[in-house]
Amino acid sequence: MKVLIFDTETTGLPDGKNPSIYDTQKWPHIIQLSYIIYDSETNDIVTLEDDYISIEDDVIIQPESQKVHNISRELLSSKGIPIEHALEKFNRFSDMSDVL
């Protein structure tokens, strides 16, 4: 069985305790999407991906979050890819997986 395990880093925390999922301005931006696909039958790692996501100049990375993940705007400028590309790639790998 192929298992996809993923993790994200963001620009901060949501604005407010329980903001609506439709109020996107209150949610942080994803700035890193990392995942592995593990084959439990062969005990092999099928793939290991680590994508930094580029963000617009007006998006603020909260200092508290940057202390946790150590992702700077400079790093995103040099290594970041558009979120659409990262999500398309993630979607392709999720199609290869039996479990998320």
Mark where each language-model region is.
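Conserved non-catalytic scaffold segment of RNase H-like nuclease domains
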Residues: K2-L100
